Structures are given as C-alpha cells and as structure tokens.
Amino acid sequence: MTQTLSQLENSGAFIERHIGPDAAQQQEMLNAVGAQSLNALTGQIVPKDIQLATPPQVGAPATEYAALAELKAIASRNKRFTSYIGMGYTAVQLPPVILRNMLENPGWYTAYTPYQPEVSQGRLEALLNFQQVTLDLTGLDMASASLLDEATAAAEAMAMAKRVSKLKNANRFFVASDVHPQTLDVVRTRAETFGFEVIVDDAQKVLDHQDVFGVLLQQVGTTGEIHDYTALISELKSRKIVVSVAADIMALVLLTAPGKQGADIVFGSAQRFGVPMGYGGPHAAFFAAKDEYKRSMPGRIIGVSKDAAGNTALRMAMQTREQHIRREKANSNICTSQVLLANIASLYAVYHGPVGLKRIANRIHRLTDILAAGLQQKGLKLRHAHYFDTLCVEVVDKAGVLARAEAAEINLRSDILNAVGITLDETTTRENVMQLFSVLLGDNHGLDIDTLDKDVAHDSRSIQAAMLRDDEILTHPVFNRYHSETEMMRYMHSLERKDLALNQAMIPLGSCTMKLNAAAEMIPITWPEFAELHPFCPPEQAEGYQQMIAQLADWLVKLTGYDAVCMQPNSGAQGEYAGLLAIRHYHESRNEGHRDICLIPASAHGTNPASAHMAGMQVVVVACDKNGNIDLTDLRAKAEQAGDNLSCIMVTYPSTHGVYEETIREVCEVVHQFGGQVYLDGANMNAQVGITSPGFIGADVSHLNLHKTFCIPHGGGGPGMGPIGVKAHLAPFVPGHSVVQIEGMLTRQGAVSAAPFGSASILPISWMYIRMMGAEGLKKASQVAILNANYIASRLQDAFPVLYTGRDGRVAHECILDIRPLKEETGISELDIAKRLIDYGFHAPTMSFPVAGTLMVEPTESESKVELDRFIDAMLAIRAEIDQVKAGVWPLEDNPLVNAPHIQSELVAEWAHPYSREVAVFPAGVADKYWPTVKRLDDVYGDRNLFCSCVPISEYQ
C-alpha cells in the first residue's frame, strides 16, 4: 500500500464531485485547446499583473459528511424559541408534499428564469396560479409574479406611485405611522435617492399634509389593529393621490380586499403561505395594481399567449418594462425575483384550496379571540378592539412578563411602550395559548380553553362587519381539485415534467453560471435550526447564524480582496443598489455629494444602469472598442468631462464580452484619478475566484451573486443573494437595519431589504460550497470553467465565429458565438438556433446579450466533457441543418429550425414538412429525449392580448 492515511481519507473528495471533467478528460480538453495544464492555460489568459501569487486562504477542503457535521454543530447554537413577534414574519406548516416535491427537488430549484418559455411551462403555470391568488385576495386587476420582500415591494410601490401620479409637482410620500418599521426603513432609503420627502404620521392626518403624490397604508397595523380605510381612500382618490396598501396574505382570506375599497396598489409578504421564516428569508412578496397602471408595474408578469400552433401557452409578458431592455429607464432594477418561494406559496394555496385556507385563517383568529378574551377577563387591557392574529397587550410589569416568557422559551414583541405584542399563526395550538396565559397572568390563572371558545364563538366582534370579506376566493378549478396528497404529488410532477432544469441537461446561459447545486449544500436549509428562527429574535438566540454568517463573510473577504462584506442585499440587483448607495454616502461624508455621474460601458448588463438610476445617479455610457473592450480614450474623455461630478464606474470583470481585459487596472486608475470609485459587478466572479480578485485588481466595491458563483440555485428565477464586498473606506456606508443592530455586522445606514441579513436561510448553501471546496478546489473550479469555455469555443469557432477573444485567441469563462453572418447569408437567426436546441435537449444560451444577433455560452466547471461534447455535437448538427437551408434543400419558411421546437402531438398529425419526423424530434445524437409541451411562443399576440390570470382548465388538456 503506497497511499498515506491522509490520501485515503480524501478530504478533497467533493472537488471531484463538483467539477465535471475528470483528470483524463481535462487533459484531453487541454490538448484540444493547445495548453499543457490548467495553470498554463489560465497563465496565458489572465493578465499577469492581476494574477494572485497564492490562492486566498480559506482553508483545506472538507468531505460532504464532515462539512455537514461541522455546520450542524454551528446550527445547534441557534435557540428555537416559539416566536410571537409577528411584524410580518410567522411560523408556518410547509406541507411535506411541497417540501419533498418542490423545495427539495432539483427539477424545481435548478431551473433558470423562464426567458425560454417553451421549456418553462410548468413553473410559468405555478406562477400564473400565484398571480391568481394575488388577484383574488387583493381585489385588483393585475399582479406580478413576485418581488423580493414586503419592504422592497413598498419601495417599489412608492416609485410606481410617482410614475403614475398626475400630481407631477408633488414630491412627498406619506407613510402611515403603524406600518412595519422595516418597511419604513427601506422606503426611506429608496426615497432619499429619488429625492422624495417621506412623511410619517397617523393615517387620519394624511389630509393635513400638502404636495403628497402617494400614500402607504397598512390594512392590519404593525401592532395588530385592523383599519377600515374605505372612506379615507375615497377622499384620497378624489384628490388624485395614489394609494398603496400593505396587506397580510392570511388576513386577506377573511378581510375585505383593499382593491374593493379603492386601493391602487396592494402588496405584502407571501411568507406565511408555507415558507419558513428562515431568519428573514428568502420570501416572495405579492404585488398587484389596477389595470390602468400595468405598464408601470415592477417585476415579472406572467401572461397567457398562444404558440405557433395556436395552443394556449404562457410567457413573461410586457418585458419592455424591464431592466434587460429599458436599462436606466426601466420601472425597476429587479432581475431575479423569488420564483421558487412564490411557487411554494402558490402550491400551498392549491393544496389547501379556499376551504382549507379559510379553516386555517379562522383557526388563527379563533385562538387569538380566545387569548384576548382570557386576558381581558383577568383585567388586562388590549390596545386595539379590532384584530386578526395580533394583540397589543398593555402590561404593568413588562420586565417580569418578558422574563417569564424567556424562561418559557417564548419570544414576545417587546419594542412597544408599556405593552407587548403577540402574533399567533397556523402552528399555534391550544397548549400554546395556555402557556401564554401563564406567561402573562401567572400559573394560577384558572382559564379554560373550551369555556372561552364557547364565549367567543357566539360573540366575536374583533373584525368589523364592514371588513369581513363577502366575495368568494380561489374559485378556479386548480384551487379546488388537488387536495389529496396523491393528486397534489401528480400535479406537481406534471408541472415539473414540462420544464428543463439542470437535473436533465446543461443550461449554457452566458452571464448566468448555471453550475451544480450539490445535494449536500441544499440539505441544511431545511434544518429547523436554520428554518424556524424569526429575523428579529434576540441576537443571543441566533449565535449559530451569526457564527455562520461571520465565517462566510470572512471567506468572501479573502476571496474578493475586500475588507468587509455586508450580507443584506437579497438579489444581485439589490447588491448593485446597496454598493452604489455606499459610494453615494461616502462622497456625501466628504462633502462631495455633487458627485452623481456613473460611467457604464456600453456592454453592461441592464441592471447596471437601472441600479445607477435608482441610486440617484446620472448614467454616462462609455464606448467599447472593436475588440469589445472598454475604450480607454473614451473613458478618459468621459471621466475628465465629469470631473468633480464623477461618482463611479460600473464595470464587469471579465467583461460581459467574455474576455479578461488587459487594461482593467488602468481603468481603475483613471477613475480614481478623477476622484471616482470603482464598482466591479460580480456577475462573472466565477472566472476570478482563486485566480484574481476585485480588491486586488483595484476595485472599491462589488456585489457577489451567491446564486451564480457560490452555488445557491436559481430556483426558476429566484431566490438570489447579492452581498457586497467593500474596501475599508466604504465599510461604514453599507446597509444597516432599524430593528436589529448587531455590533460589527450592521451599520447605522438605512436598510435595502426587510431583514437584516437578507435571505439568511440560504447562506448555508454558499458556506457548504466554500467549506467543501477549500482554497484548492475553488481555484480549480475557476480554471475548469475557463477550460470548458475555451474547449467549446475552439470546437465551434469554424462553424460559429467567436466574436471576442483576448490574448492568443482565448476567452474567459464564456464565449459569444456570432450568428449575424449566418443570418445575413441564410435567414436563420439566433432565435431559430435557440429553439432548435430544445429539440436536441438543451436550454438555449443567452440570446442577443451583450450583442444583438449572438449567442453567449457559459458551460461552468460542473459540466463533464461528455455533456460538453453533446452540446457541441448538437450545435454542429444545427450548423449542418443551416447549410441544408442555404443549399435550398429545405426552404427558409419550412425547415427544422424555423419550426422548432417540435412537440409530440405533431408526430400523430398530418406531416407536410420537407424533412422527416425523425429529423424533427430525434435529430442526430439525441437519445434521452426532452419533450417541450408547446411550440414557439407568439410574443406579439401575448402583448397585444394581455391576460395574466388563470385560464380555464380545459386549455391545458
């Protein structure tokens, strides 16, 4: 035996699990691209002056089992008290059928945002159901497919109110004083950059204030009071003031829809429809508005359209509102939202149906009535007579009550003067209520649940008669069928089968980094120690979270070359916004608040200019040269022209053209010379980790897409995480939080997300990835990602020219295939190729970004040579098909490309095409067939005939 014990223990075993090509395959690919080793290849490609001499020291790799045991020990430091804190977060009962078949199912969580609707019909249907739930509960006409959280939805409502307001000279936004404090925090942050004045006052005093363009009310106030705002809304509408209402999704099951009371915009958190609290997220927000405002709405909207055969099909509608098209003129910078969480909430509603939801809501309310009756019998006073699930109880000995609660491992809301808040939820039992009686009244209270139940059942006045819902909800068949677990399991599987996710094939989307989301990384997110914590619980109950977050932040600091990391932003777009705010506040601290010009290369991702606009900056575009690199001459000219008004540059590295620009350090130096800061977009961090770093390059701040580089799955369009890394001088200006302050982890700045650490419950995924890969594995992952991209580029460049390359004709971790010459020559477009790839079993690469008429391919390090070769063979076969069109064998108007994708029903229909059925659906090399369920979508029909709610069930049959 020649191996040592250390070798046999194989602590780096996960590295080989994560990286697709084995050593032999890597060598074959290196030979194909003309490089001797991974180090030699990256040494050729990455500019010498930015190569790290040694990898960042983030530790040795650990096995899956060792890492899980280590993280379990950390998680066990969290204390699982029963939390009645409320404030927009409650405990839930996630149905096991949804837990197992969606949250723990890679067929759902590894899919991408449904830009390619033909391979996304399942989750699009689930999202359409989510929109229908939103429409029914809010009483409005148009709903989005989720926003990031309730507080950011409030900020979006404010921005939308200004867009649609007819009071163009008004610049004040009124917020009722009993909205959740974290909502107000995020609204204030957003208002500052937009130049809005925020007024906070009692809702009934809103008419005392002048020049108000919009109002934010909360139907059930933060301390529990149900408000009937019907008359107030009517008066506000008569004055042309846009009214937004924050609502509780479970309360809406019983309460009057705000839309029926005249509200223009209604939003809230869908968390309590089955999504664990998770120390703050991720959670989906719902958002609805009147039909007349639909083109001003933020976020994704799913619409019903037709496919090429005239069959009903779903798609993302009205995308011209969004950042990837409208850039700085977009309604919002939102890119990824919260699709996976919206779909959990959607299926929660499907599984329970209207009867089940009413039973849950009524049970919560009944237990709240029982608690209220018992407390009042014993002489305690409630601050509000009307409530749904939350009581504000006035107490004399508040310290004693809180001490007894702590001894009983109970969290009450403690920030209310001379009172405590108690919010019940669907997990609350009669035993819990008895325990609350003991905490508030002492053990000898003498109260009986059944006696109290009889009293309140016949005389409950806690919901005003005018506020009781009098219309039916969720009448569509989809909410009234799938109530047995067998039916639900089959329905979810039928949706999953319609979609193409990473569990079936490579998803070669450029700028998206669709890498492995390993099972070991996913396991901890459903551990109760992580899933069940309230984000506003006392910090000493979340020591496990704090340790995990601090350790992850330390690793990210080392990997990025920055000095500090803030975990709050809950998407990449939010990270951009937070980073730009840090720059803005830094300049203001130096009495240079006039610096408001943001330079952005022409090739930038659409979120960059949209985020800059949100941060109150002016966007100035910097040209790219013929090689796709930043034009240094133009950069210097624009920087000099901006002068003392230069705030920053937003640059992506490697560039969005898939190249390591040789002059990146010079770019940083030019901007610094004129007093600006360098924002390095972390979208392409997968080509930096272990090789170089933003801080080493010379940047001041970056966001990190943990859902790209660090293995959080895309979830079909969310969740994401976008923490920001900053140099020391920017660290005091990262987001803070008004409710929670943890020394060394949060600043006193305004918040950008509802929870202090954003979507904290998915951070264990990135922790596990880094822990299992170690410094050695992380560097190798970057190197193999570069190898895979260069292998594809070298194999395809004769058939599809690679548009941009760096030194020696190399690319970074992705490559752009130029389809424009072929289109000009043959009429076949990048869209045709993208749709034909579906017939070969692949999701399309990124289309027409960053250059129109191109396909951008990013294979990631997780794809094996076998899968890469399968993709290459498919692309070469498609090129041969294009040649058939060029040669006149198939006419341009009738060939396998323009008719793609092909569906099963076509095989049994009359066949009049000049190519065979076999060529259509079993092209060369296709063995394990993926079947799309719809043909190519008719986008024009969808936008001209906008329909964004559930269609009759017969349409799906």
UniProtKB/Swiss-Prot annotation:
Iron-sulfur is among the record's keywords: no
Pfam family, one: GDC-P
Cofactor(s) annotated in UniProt: pyridoxal 5'-phosphate
Catalytic activity: N(6)-[(R)-lipoyl]-L-lysyl-[glycine-cleavage complex H protein] + glycine + H(+) = N(6)-[(R)-S(8)-aminomethyldihydrolipoyl]-L-lysyl-[glycine-cleavage complex H protein] + CO2
GO BP, sorted A to Z: glycine decarboxylation via glycine cleavage system
EC number(s) per entry: 1.4.4.2
GO CC term, one of those recorded: glycine cleavage complex
Protein's UniProt keywords contain Protein transport: no
Family, as annotated: Belongs to the GcvP family.
Assembly: The glycine cleavage system is composed of four proteins: P, T, L and H.
Name under which the protein is recorded: Glycine dehydrogenase (decarboxylating)
